[in-house]
Structure formats: C-alpha cells, structure tokens
C-alpha cells in the first residue's frame, strides 16, 4: 500500500512538473486570407474586393489571442439602388485548440470575435417614400457609418513545413448595429461583414507563418 501511495505521489509530481514546464508564450503567427479575394473576383467580377490578414499569439499550446484586420471596396445594388463604398475593419478575439495534444500545430479550433468597421459610401437611385407622399429616387453622397458585430468561428489548422501552416475558418456573424441614425440611409455592404444582414456567414482559407 505504501509503495502504491509513493508511486501515485511520484506520478502526480512528474505530471505537475511537466505541466509547469510548458512556456506561456510560444510564438507569433501572421496569416494571409486567400479565399475572399478569389471568391469575390469570381462572384462579382471584381466589383467587391475584400482583403485581410490575421496575427495571433500561441499561449500554453492551446490558446490563440487573435487580431484580424482588412480593407474592402464594394459596388453593389439592391431594389434598384446602388452602393459604392470603401473602408476598413478589425476583429479581436481568441481561439481555443479543441484537442489538447502537445506542441503540434495540427488541430481543430473554435473561437469568438468582436468586430467593427468604418466606411465611407455613396447611395444612388434609392427608393424613398414618406407617409402619403409618392415614392421618389434620391441620392446620398459622402455617407459615413460605424458598424459592429460578433462572430463564432470554427476551423482547423495544419502544419506544412518550417513554420508554414494553412487552414480554414467558417464564421457565423451577428450584426449589433441594426438601426440608422436620423437622416442616415443604411449601406448595403459592410466591410468585413458582407451584405448587410442581421445574420451572416463567412469563410476564410489562409496560409501563414509562425515565428
């Protein structure tokens, strides 16, 4: 019995030493999204252009605080009106490696993001009707808009060679800024979010390098 107790205490101490020996900070990665530029070029013939990069730190083999930022330009329409705008966006959040399996980069990831975007835009030929007045088409130039939303993300990353890795993310997006200010007309497109909807989705396929 004493031998069994000694063996248990030794194993526990060894496990504790192993856990304590994991460094907190384990490098920084930079990622470039390849999916959005290709998808939008094919889908909209270049009328929507969306570019983004991401930076994340690796902590304790499992946690990945992440900053994503980018720039988008869009020419699109709805109900006969036309939107032309450009602006930047940023997302801040953290990913968690689902499987705790040591120092490997290969893993499934889940995470959350808080995102915001600023843009300037023009809306032309917009259908407007007020009370009993007949509908008319109006133009709104030099509009400015701030939007924010939350995201739930899931995906995977795969180690390639000497710091190079690749992976993908699927995103579910929930728009928080749903109301317009007095005298403001909502944009049809939001950088980083996509077409303006209360719920939206997105996909990223990236290649990155960890330093």
Residue ranges and their predicted role:
Residues 26, 47-51, 86-90, 106, ...:
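Residues that define the transmembrane beta-barrel architecture of outer-membrane proteins
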Residues 29-35, 68-77, 128-137, 183-188:
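Flexible, solvent-exposed coil segments and beta strand-coil junctions
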């Amino acid at each position: 019995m004493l031998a069994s107790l000694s063996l248990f205490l030794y194993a526990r101490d060894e496990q504790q030493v192993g856990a304590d020996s994991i460094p907190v900070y384990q490098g920084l990665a930079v990622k470039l999204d390849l999916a959005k530029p290709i998808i939008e070029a094919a889908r909209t013939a270049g009328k929507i252009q969306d570019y983004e990069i991401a930076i994340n730190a690796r902590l304790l083999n499992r946690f990945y605080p992440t900053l994503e930022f980018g720039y988008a330009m869009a020419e699109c329409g709805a109900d006969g009106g036309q939107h032309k705008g450009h602006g930047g966006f940023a997302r801040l959040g953290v990913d968690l490696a689902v499987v705790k399996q040591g120092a490997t980069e290969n893993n499934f990831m889940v995470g959350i993001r808080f995102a915001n975007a600023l843009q300037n835009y023009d809306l032309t030929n917009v259908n407007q009707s007020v009370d009993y007045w007949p509908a008319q088409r109006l133009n709104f130039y030099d509009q400015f808009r701030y939007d924010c939303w939350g995201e739930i993300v899931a995906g995977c990353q795969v180690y390639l060679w000497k710091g190079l890795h690749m992976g993908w993310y699927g995103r579910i997006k929930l728009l928080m800024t749903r109301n317009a200010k007095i005298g403001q007309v909502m944009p049809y497109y939001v950088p980083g979010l996509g077409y303006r909807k209360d719920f939206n989705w997105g996909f990223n396929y990236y290649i990155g390098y960890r330093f």
